[in-house]
Amino acid sequence: MIEKVPMTAGGYAALEVELKQRQSVDRPRIIEHIAEARSHGDLSENAEYHAAKEEQSHNEGRIAELEDKLARADIIDISKLSGDTIKFGATVTLIDEDTEKKAVWQIVGEPEADAKKGRISITSPLARALIGKKKGASVEVVAPGGAKAYEITKVEWR
């Protein structure tokens, strides 16, 4: 059975943009670099050629990965979600029970997770601890850095 990849419409669009960039801009540029390096003669000691081939391999691998994720995408329209129970797409405000620090996280699909932008993967330890909980609940998260306790102070749909 093909496993679906949950993501927001914005996450899907970002993957499409990256795929198009890699196919229509990066791929031709890399092919040009390979041709240019090839014209310099002996390929066995041609570092420029080997670097371009490695870049091509990396780019083609990422293209295949993007095509796979887009083909398996399960786009979830967050604007149609509501309620006070945390699930995919929720934006959750937490207070660290030890430090009293506030943190805001949106639960998104794996391909669009970016901690710097406040977006955590639905498969992360924190998201797994939050799913199904409501405002006012306390959760304990066991992560590689140790156990942390949080209080859920707000659940939003943005």
UniProtKB/Swiss-Prot annotation:
<dbReference type="Pfam" id="PF01272">
    <property type="entry name" value="GreA_GreB"/>
</dbReference>
<keyword id="KW-0805">Transcription regulation</keyword>
<comment type="similarity">
    <text>Belongs to the GreA/GreB family.</text>
</comment>
<dbReference type="GO" id="GO:0070063">
    <property type="term" value="F:RNA polymerase binding"/>
</dbReference>
<dbReference type="InterPro" id="IPR036805">
    <property type="entry name" value="Tscrpt_elong_fac_GreA/B_N_sf"/>
</dbReference>
<dbReference type="InterPro" id="IPR001437">
    <property type="entry name" value="Tscrpt_elong_fac_GreA/B_C"/>
</dbReference>
<dbReference type="InterPro" id="IPR028624">
    <property type="entry name" value="Tscrpt_elong_fac_GreA/B"/>
</dbReference>
<feature type="coiled-coil region">
    <location>
        <begin position="47"/>
        <end position="74"/>
    </location>
</feature>
<dbReference type="InterPro" id="IPR036953">
    <property type="entry name" value="GreA/GreB_C_sf"/>
</dbReference>
<dbReference type="GO" id="GO:0006354">
    <property type="term" value="P:DNA-templated transcription elongation"/>
</dbReference>
<dbReference type="GO" id="GO:0032784">
    <property type="term" value="P:regulation of DNA-templated transcription elongation"/>
</dbReference>
<dbReference type="InterPro" id="IPR023459">
    <property type="entry name" value="Tscrpt_elong_fac_GreA/B_fam"/>
</dbReference>
<comment type="function">
    <text>Necessary for efficient RNA polymerase transcription elongation past template-encoded arresting sites. The arresting sites in DNA have the property of trapping a certain fraction of elongating RNA polymerases that pass through, resulting in locked ternary complexes. Cleavage of the nascent transcript by cleavage factors such as GreA or GreB allows the resumption of elongation from the new 3'terminus. GreA releases sequences of 2 to 3 nucleotides.</text>
</comment>
<dbReference type="GO" id="GO:0003677">
    <property type="term" value="F:DNA binding"/>
</dbReference>
<keyword id="KW-0238">DNA-binding</keyword>
<keyword id="KW-0175">Coiled coil</keyword>
<dbReference type="InterPro" id="IPR022691">
    <property type="entry name" value="Tscrpt_elong_fac_GreA/B_N"/>
</dbReference>
<dbReference type="InterPro" id="IPR018151">
    <property type="entry name" value="TF_GreA/GreB_CS"/>
</dbReference>
<dbReference type="Pfam" id="PF03449">
    <property type="entry name" value="GreA_GreB_N"/>
</dbReference>
<dbReference type="InterPro" id="IPR006359">
    <property type="entry name" value="Tscrpt_elong_fac_GreA"/>
</dbReference>
<keyword id="KW-0804">Transcription</keyword>
<protein>
    <recommendedName>
        <fullName>Transcription elongation factor GreA</fullName>
    </recommendedName>
</protein>
